[in-house]
């Protein structure tokens, strides 16, 4: 596939935002909203908070459809504000809360935006899944919050807008994704004493990938795999969508785009290395040839704790790493012939013109279709490639509204393509 390339690379590392200032660093308790508390990241964040007595005040929790779990979380942490995705869930949630506990409850994306911009909240953990997290993330940025960002799609879709909004509002981004958090930790020396680390002497970022459940297999072997096999990730416990993205390597493609926006380096300076043990989470190569790596167990509580506690490190009960017991670590280059989604993501980012929006929307719809057994494993990459080929827009979306309009337009087109394919077979 050939996509017209319009973007020019940026020459040096330039972090997306200023870093949190002294007032935030010294705030006790640190006030927090968690958007997506019932998902994998949200649940892990609450595990971290349980060990931090007096250090945080959980002001707001928001979940999507698991209302009983949200009610259980709310009963334990007693936030003043709750959010649900559907208006119809408010009554159910209210009925499950303890007698005498009456928080405010908001609904829908507008409700999530409200919780992201509460006056008394300093920190927002953005942990919604997919493009659905963009509006609330962007609202938090415009409100000048410190955002612990787990919703990578916000940067994939609107990285340039978010960078500009951070500059205007003073918002700060701290990356929760394990790979980008690892890079952030490796850059700690470059960040020291600077609120705006624009010019770290970095030559390369190396994102590690587990390879997913199908590492080492060829295309013929993968033609007939189904959701059950693709969901069997060897190392990480994650939600269904991101687990499928790991199997196709689309997750790593999205992370390349995320890294480009977070760290400002050109795509040519962002590489992927398959490391099936998931112990080294990423590496930074400096201009003198040295490389720094961050190692740890494959457990999201570590990067979550690093973001919530920054610049301090929080206590966690994650099992400690025993390198002697591991014995050895392995590395390989990704097989981009067998896993074409990785290159599709690179092409989309290089092309611009809203192509990353199309890439993400088509992938989300294709993954849903694969999980429903409406398309095969390679149907995911085929659907994404076809959506990119059909995209004719010649300019970048100029606002969040334009981005989400393109997102919806792409989804409608992709659903029609998937339905037409099913009707033919």
Language model region names:
Residues 1-425:
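Catalytic, metal-anchored helix/loop core of enzyme active sites in primary metabolism
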């Amino acid at each position: 596939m050939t996509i017209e390339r319009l973007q020019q690379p940026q020459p040096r590392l330039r972090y997306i935002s200023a870093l949190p200032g002294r007032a935030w660093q010294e705030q006790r308790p640190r006030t927090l909203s968690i958007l997506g508390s019932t998902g994998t990241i949200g649940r892990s964040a609450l595990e971290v908070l349980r060990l931090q007595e007096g250090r945080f005040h959980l002001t707001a929790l928001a979940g999507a459809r698991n209302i009983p779990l949200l009610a259980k979380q709310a009963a334990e942490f007693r936030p003043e504000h709750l959010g649900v995705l559907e208006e119809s869930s408010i009554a159910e949630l209210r009925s499950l809360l303890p007698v005498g506990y009456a928080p405010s409850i908001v609904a829908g994306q507008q409700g999530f935006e409200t919780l992201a911009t509460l006056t008394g909240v300093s920190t927002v953990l953005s942990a919604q899944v997919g493009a659905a997290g963009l509006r609330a993330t962007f609202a938090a940025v415009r409100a000048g919050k410190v955002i612990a960002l787990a919703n990578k799609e916000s940067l994939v879709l609107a990285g340039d807008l978010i960078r500009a909004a951070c500059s205007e509002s003073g918002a700060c981004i701290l990356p929760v994704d394990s790979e980008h958090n690892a890079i952030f930790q490796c850059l700690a020396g470059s960040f020291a004493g600077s609120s705006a680390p624009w010019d770290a002497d970095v030559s390369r970022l190396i994102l590690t990938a587990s390879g997913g459940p199908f590492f080492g297999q060829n295309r013929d072997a993968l033609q007939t795999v189904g959701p059950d096999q693709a969901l069997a990730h060897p190392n990480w416990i994650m939600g269904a969508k991101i687990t499928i993205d790991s199997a196709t390597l689309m997750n790593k493609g999205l992370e390349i785009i995320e890294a480009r926006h977070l760290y400002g380096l050109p795509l040519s300076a962002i590489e992927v290395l398959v490391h099936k043990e998931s112990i080294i989470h990423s590496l930074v190569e400096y201009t003198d040839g040295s490389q720094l790596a961050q190692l740890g167990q494959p457990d999201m509580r570590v990067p979550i704790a690093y973001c919530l506690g920054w610049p301090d490190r929080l206590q966690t009960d994650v099992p400690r790493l025993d390198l002697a017991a591991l014995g050895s670590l392995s590395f390989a280059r990704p097989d981009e012939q067998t896993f074409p989604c990785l290159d599709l993501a690179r092409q989309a980012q290089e092309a611009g013109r809203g192509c990353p929006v199309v890439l993400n929307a088509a992938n989300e719809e294709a993954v849903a279709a694969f999980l429903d057994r409406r398309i095969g494993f390679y149907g995911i990459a085929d659907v994404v490639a076809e959506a990119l080929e059909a995209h004719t827009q010649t300019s970048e979306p100029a606002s969040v509204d334009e981005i989400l309009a393109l997102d919806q337009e792409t989804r409608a087109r992709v659903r029609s393509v998937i339905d037409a394919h099913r009707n033919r077979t």
